[in-house]
Amino acid sequence: GTIPAISRRQFIQAGSALAALPFVVKTGKVQAQGAAVSDTTPEEKVVQTCSTFDCGGKCDIRAHVSEGVVTRISTRPDNALDPQMPVMRACVRGRAYRKFVYHPDRLKYPMKRVGKRGEGKFERITWDEATTLIANQLKTITQKYGAASRYVHVGTAVSGGTFSGDKMVRRLLNLTGGYLESYHSVSMGNTAAATPYTYGTAASGSSLDTLLDTKLVILWGHNPTETIFGHSNHFYQKMKQNGTRFIVVDPRYSDTVSSLADQWIPLLPTTDNALMDAMMYVIVTENLHDRDFIQRYTLGFDEDTMPEGVPANESLMAYLSGAKDGVAKTPEWAEKITHVPAQTIRQLARDYATTKPAALIQGWGPQRHNCGERTARGSTLLATLTGNVGVKGGWAAGYGGCANRKFAAGPEMPDNPVKAKISVMNWVQAADDASQVTADVGLKDAEKLDSNIRILFSLAGNYLANQNPDLHQATRVLEDESKIEFIVASDLFMTPSARYADLLVPEPSSMERWNIGETWGTASYLILSEKLIEPEFERRSDYDWLREVAAKLGVEPAFSEGRDEKAWIEHIWEQTRLSMPDENLPDFATLQKTRQHLFKSAPFVAFEDNIRDPQNHPFPTPSGKIEIFSKRLYDMHHPEIPALSHYVPAHEGPEDALAKRFPLQLITWKGKNRANSTQYANPWLIEAQQQKLWINPQDAQKRGIAQGDTVRIHNARGICEIPAEVTPRIIPGVVAMQAGAWWQPDEQGIDKGGCANVLSSARITALAKGNSHQTMLVEVAKA
């Protein structure tokens, strides 16, 4: 049962050699094309599965299982690709999964904290002791503070599956009085909140098969080559082969730029709206805008199309011409702000406006700035001016979710008796001093909170500390045991967040449990994630031990409905079948053979009906039109929420006075070797992309920094020390590191792991009350 050690270099060499050979097996049998489960030897079976990490790919991982052990991982052979399915070839994360499953440092037993919270000192206890402790703490804390003192944190490591511990603990809490809910997605919550102010809905995306004849694609802060965002990269590569031109707007020369782009346009972070404003200025002053489209479908373009009750000079044309502030939004104006040459801005605007159709597709990185809502809406205004909304081959920009997406049903959730909701960004405040959580910072459905957070569940999540913006602010509250009285965490490893648990329990990997994987983006398919091997040591699924807790609280029959984990997956699948009779989903027994289901849908163009027949299909906005100017935003009277979504200098942006002290903008990217922080511990993947600070040669030279030097990245919130990567792939004035590295503080509190959240800000965005991880100013020096 032991797994022989193998280096990554040996792994790659072996893989390269095998790639040249036909797909053969020991017995001489060739695996049937497309077969999902096959017996290759009497001892070994090959099973199609997927991970349920916070990753949108849901790739075709082939687990080779022999005598209860995963011996290796492959992917679907190219000669067996299903023409009806997206290309599901497993990426480096999926191919390295076995090293994650069999890592010697995985948690093995339930443990109780014995040192100070955060020290990481624990002692082993039994499962009966663990579930009794949880049940007793729930009873005591609920009786003392009420159900609103109970909170469930983000469970990102299993968010790619339909069934997870964070969902089931919510079910348990709802059956026993409720809990304090949170809203907002830290991935895309800002754009999801902003896009409806233009279109009336966040679902502004089309299916990717409508783009195959698109002549120009602008990827704005989007990096699908590395992130594997729902397999869109395969569509883009096919489009490029067919002659589509790609322009990438990004401060960093990403792998997407190197593999797709005909042109790279770098800009200073947080200045996106200035670039967009200048593009719109060029488009309207050169009469490149789609006048008929604007006249028929929009509100707020000029003074003649403004809503009632708004004074003069608030329209888009008035803003661009400088009628109110005396500043015309010319490319020369934008060049000083963005550092994009004026002529490049002019050409980008002309290319976008005159190429029909064209698609401006935003990634979610730019909207994770404290100006992110404005950036998201700004892209929708550009799409509107050029008439690229509701047409095949165009793209409405903004959030980009697809309205025809279909999802599996989840476990049924009883009503929550606690009505108050907080933004996920408010949890530290709610734990520290609940009176500070008001409507101004995101409290919903209540005038005030009834209690501080006193008991917290963090199941399969590293957001408690590592992924939380302004990590030190969060850990100060976590370390104060008079605040949160009991923290339950489950994980595969002793992550930086797990160290703050009072009770820490070992979780199985996705190969040791049942689930259904769902894709992101527009790759609408479901894939079965079967329990392939038994968990070792005393690892148990969250649901399994939650049943014990439910029994000790007297609600087990209502909680489990008599189902084990596999029965829940079968139930969820059957509920999904019933909810989609037109899909003809197979029954569960058949699914266990076919392994996957691709949703049947014709090419889908967002807002096609609204454009084709606006009388019978008005936009779901107050005016029934595309709202270039939003009266709803105007009535908020907030300087950071302009009704037109134009450029406003960001807090900690390049124009902030703080830039004199901390002159470099730090951004992070999602890399190829992990999903957020998940798989950080995988030794193969650590080698695949080392944690370094990208710094431009000009900035490095000023600071006496050479390639490979350890550098100190610091601001008022924290200090981080990692090696420098001196490269022209990042523009001057900006530095970058990969997101998701584990926090590793030394005795002085200096992070040696490259965790950007020791430097990031917990400032919430003005409209969505969301996260702005990406907006931070730093200085860099040789350590």
Label the model's feature ranges.
Residues 1-288, 459, 701, 746-783:
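N-terminal export/assembly segments and adjacent metallocofactor-ligating motifs
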Residues 254-355:
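Long, well-ordered, tryptophan-enriched scaffold segments
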Residues 181, 289-292, 345, 359-360, ...:
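Acidic/polar loop patches that form or flank catalytic/metal-binding clefts of enzymes
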Residues 1, 165-249, 273-274, 336, ...:
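Extended redox/cofactor-interaction regions of prokaryotic respiratory oxidoreductases
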Residues 208, 511-535, 545-552:
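Glycine/threonine-rich phosphate-binding loop and adjacent beta-strand/alpha-helix elements that clamp
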Residues 542-591, 678-679, 683-693, 698-783:
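Long, contiguous, secondary-structure-rich segments that constitute the structural scaffold
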